[in-house]
Design a protein with these regions (language model features):
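Terminal leader/tail segments of proteins
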Residues: 1-290
Length: 290
């Protein structure tokens, strides 16, 4: 999830940078006009919004207070402490009859290492209604301008094994390379055992690719839930994967490329990663969509 303030006791006041100097926070102005809407009202509209990049977190938009409808927000008694930014103050948003409690936060007196954020506020993404960059709506979280996605056609033989059976085999896959994520293999439906796929009600959204729908794989009496996804209408920046099918590397028996088994990655969708995150929360990376 994004780097919103973490609820914790506010007893410590010393900057975490003193004990963890390798921790990174970058606060960078965005050249895009960014807007936020709630209950039909524009509550933030700025050409001076900043992206905050933070170790192990997704980017977050911060807005100058001058570009935010602070008159629609009421300070609350809620506070949280971040060892790298300081103590966060919160505001409840109210427009008409709708209220979003503690939906807005800021650091009025941040640590000196991040002093620039002091006159800015941020919004919990899912507590407001709509986000826009220029005139296009964006979803899930801000897109990272330093992230790259390449979908490249390959004639290498790709085989997907589930439940001991080859459920997909192709020399027409598109290999999707995405910064800091495992390679994904998008396969034409003609090269997938579609008779084994059962449409699922699950959908997810990715800010870089669009909205995905899912399929489960049924082999005999065994159902492998939500193992496959597809983007029927990807966003304009990612057209090459339209209608292709992709299997979770983490959960199939094997993915073979030219006969060689691809090592299973440890990602936010892996059981090993999830187990580790329960015991060492700070090791968790950002949860993006596959």
């Amino acid at each position: 999830m994004a780097a919103a303030p973490q609820a914790r006791e506010t007893v410590a006041r010393e900057s975490g940078f003193k004990t963890n100097p390798d921790y990174k926070i970058l606060f960078e102005r965005s050249p895009r006009r960014v807007r936020v809407e709630f209950n039909g009202e524009t509550i933030a509209d700025s050409t001076a919004a900043h992206l905050l990049f933070e170790t192990r977190h997704l980017p977050v938009y911060y807005f100058p207070r001058a570009d935010v409808r602070m008159d629609l927000m009421t300070p609350t008694d809620h506070h949280t402490f971040c060892p790298y930014k300081g103590t966060a103050a919160y505001w409840t948003l109210k427009v008409g009859e709708r209220t979003a409690e503690n939906a807005v936060w800021g650091y009025p007196q941040p640590f000196e290492e991040v002093a620039a954020i002091g006159d800015f506020v941020a919004f919990y993404w899912d507590r407001v209604d709509h986000w826009y960059e220029e005139d296009e709506e964006i979803f899930v979280h801000p897109r990272d301008p330093y992230k790259r996605i390449d979908a490249i056609q390959s004639s290498r033989l790709v085989q997907i094994v589930v439940g001991g059976e080859i459920v997909a085999e192709t020399r027409r896959a598109r290999f999707l390379f995405e910064t800091r994520l495992p390679t994904r293999y998008y396969i034409p439906p003609e090269d997938v055992r579609m008779d084994l796929l059962v449409p699922s009600d699950k959908t997810t959204a990715c800010p870089y690719k669009g909205r995905a729908r899912y399929y489960s794989v049924k082999i005999g009496d065994q159902v492998y839930q939500d193992l496959v996804w597809s983007y029927p209408d990807p966003i304009a920046e990612c057209p090459k994967i339209k209608g292709l099918l992709c299997f979770f590397n983490e959960h199939v028996d094997e993915i073979r490329v030219d006969g060689k088994v691809v090592p299973k990655p440890v990602t936010p969708w892996s059981k090993d990663w999830q187990d580790k995150a329960k015991t060492v929360p700070d090791q968790r990376g950002p949860v993006a969509r596959p």
